[in-house]
Each structure stands twice: as C-alpha cells, then as structure tokens.
Amino acid sequence: MKRKPAVAGYFYPERKDELYSLLSSFAIPEQHVSGTIIGAVVPHAGIIYSGRTAMYSYRAIEKSAVRDFVIIGPNHRPLTPYASLYPEGEWSTPLGDALINDRMAEALYRDSNYIVKDEESHLMEHSVEVQIPFLQYLFGDGFRFVPVILGDQEIDVARDIGEAIMKIEDPFIFIASSDFTHYEDAKRVEKKDMDLISAILTLDLDKFYSVLEKENVTACGYGAIAALMYYTKKRGGRMIFLNHSNSGDVTGDYSEVVGYASLVSVIP
C-alpha cells in the first residue's frame, strides 16, 4: 500500500522544488558528536517553524552509515489506545517515495505487547510524516523506515516499546518525534522545556514523567521520548542536547509559542 501525504501544503510545501529549497535554507553546520548515534529527538511542527532545530539532529545523523530508521511519534487523533504500526508499503512526499522496512516492522510488532498493525490511524497523522522529507533530503531513496504512533504514552508503554526495540537485530536509528511546550509565552516555554531536557539527559523515566506532570509540560510526543530514553539507557548510552528554539523565532511574536528541541542519543 502507498500512503499519500496528509500534510503537504500545510506542514511543508507540496511542490518538490519549494520543499527542497526550504530544507536547503537551514544552513546548520555539520554536527560532530562523540560516539555512535543510535537515536534522536526531533520536532514535527510546520517545517518553516521547527525545521531549523530538527536539522541539528539530522545533520548529526547524516554522518552515520545506518540507513534504517524507527520513527515513533504521538497520535494526535487517537482512534485506538495502542501503539499503531504501519507495517508495510511506501509513503509518498513531494520528494518521492520512502519504503517501509517490513521485516523490521514485523519484528517490532512481534516483540511488543502494545503495538498493533493499524494503517488507518496513520492516514491523517503528521508526526512521522514530517520526518520523511528530512531523510529524503539527506539520503534520497537510500533509506527505509518503520512508522509507529502512540495513542497511549504512559510509562509502561514506553518501557515495552523500548524493550521491543532492543530486540531488533539489524542496525537502525530511533527517531522520537515530539514538539515541546505549547502555546505559552517564550520565557515560560524555555523554562519548562529546559527543565524537561534536563530530565531527558538523566535517562531517568520517573523523573521525566514527574517533570511532565508537575510543570505541566505539554510535550506531545513524550512517550516516544521516554521510549528512546529507556532504549538509550539499556544500550549504555547518553543523550546530547543540540538545540532549542520556539515558533516566535520565525513569527516574531513571543507571546504564545511552541517549543522545539533537538537531541541525539549516542553509545561509546
């Protein structure tokens, strides 16, 4: 099955030349990190707003030889309370078609207690789709991916998915798709986001969920981030913070913004 783009013309340009030009405009220098990259946290808002921050992670990933990606984001319109996997086929964007790694998808489905095969939930969801043009920009059609969106983002689900991902045998990079605090003034957004980023860097899931609750951090993909934290800790790795920004940096209006962050996960 070929999935058509749901948010082309809304979250990113629907014309190939305009999309490529937008991605090219993010003049982010090469990101040198110590260690082997196994994961990243990236935003998924309109690319004009969050793309520059996202590109920090992708510029770090660019140096890796790995070309398989497990991309997990939130389901903003959950039809099921589960983790929904799109198990096979292709996804189209204005830059071309991206192929799902169906063997890796099947392994993830087999080893998780929460993941279900559910193409329908993906049809209008943008949290995974917005990542595909970045990968196409960097790697053309030379990559494959596994898309998962979470209707339930609680800690038990994050641990389960982290465990299932641990069992994948082939090399891959885990991309956790999430925006951070939504629709508050820029100073409050920066404070909340940096507190959550500090918790992410500890790889302590209990602390992470505590900060989310106590500070009311409205990071929409927190379950994906938590799964990446769990996986990173199990692999003996660490998280590295690369960049933070907010939508006001583009609009000029800092009274009500959305926060974005890029981090990468590395092992020695």
From Swiss-Prot:
User: Gene3D superfamilies per the record?
Assistant: LigB-like
Question: Pfam families, from UniProt?
Answer: Memo
Q: What family is this?
A: Belongs to the MEMO1 family.
Q: Which NCBIfam families match?
A: AmmeMemoSam_B, PRK00782.1
What protein name is recorded for this chain?
A: MEMO1 family protein Ta0237
Record organism? Thermoplasma acidophilum (strain ATCC 25905 / DSM 1728 / JCM 9062 / NBRC 15155 / AMRC-C165)
